[in-house]
Amino acid sequence: MPNIEYELNEKIHAIIINPYLTWEDFCANCDLIKKYNIKNISTSLNYLDDFKNRLSNYSANINALISYPLADLPVTFIEELVNFAKDKGANGIEYLPNFINLSKGNLETFAAEIEQVKLSGLPVSIIINKSKLQKEVFINVIEICLELGIKNFQFGDGFGPTITSNDVREILKIIGSQNQIKVVGGIKKLKQVIDLFDNGISSVGTSNFCEIFQEVKVI
């Protein structure tokens, strides 16, 4: 039996981003979030109002995904969208930066982009797909973010292989255990979740949260 001595309702983040959800499906997800007392949600800008209305009497951190999944947001629009998220009640920003600036050697441009996201004062989590970055670029991303005071990192974007235990060890070695590390992508089973937590990961994000919590109930 896996060790489930974790606050799973706080450490498993519900991801609700499917643009094809029916209203009935969206409401059902909200009911499940309340049923399992899930305290952290990642969602798109378009769903912020709906969450605010459906979860009006429920306490949860709602993080808005910006520039996800294509990192195609021009820098000139960052402030407007981040402020929009803040005005709509987002408690944090999960941001996918433009990595090509680093491969061009434009470290200052990359840093300026991250600083622009931070201007709102909301907690910022930087999304990184380790498997798609050259090692030098990957290390540059981490170093710049840490220098700018970023303390929250998400590894995996749902497009690529699942993070391995070797990846986790490498990430922790670079980032350190004092920062918050969330893993996303391919997480469907309770055992995956527990293994990641046992290896030092802070939290996981998944759209399969209902199935995972159903496993917990069986145990």
Which residue ranges define each predicted feature?
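Conserved anion-binding
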Residues: 77-86, 92-154
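Short beta->alpha junction loops
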Residues: 18-20, 128-131, 158
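Structural preference for beta-strand elements that scaffold enzyme active sites
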Residues: 9-11, 39-42, 59-65, 91-94, ...
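Glycine-rich phosphate-binding active-site loops on the catalytic face of alpha/beta enzymes
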Residues: 15, 64-69, 88-102, 147-164, ...
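Conserved N-terminal beta1-alpha1 strand-loop-helix module at the mouth
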Residues: 1-88, 135, 140, 144-146
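Catalytic cores of alpha/beta
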Residues: 73-87, 133-144, 166-168, 173-181, ...
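Alpha/beta catalytic cores of nucleotide-metabolism and tRNA/nucleoside-modifying enzymes
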Residues: 1-28, 169, 173-180, 188-219
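Alpha-helix-loop-beta-strand connector modules within alpha/beta enzyme cores
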Residues: 45, 49-70, 107-132, 162-189
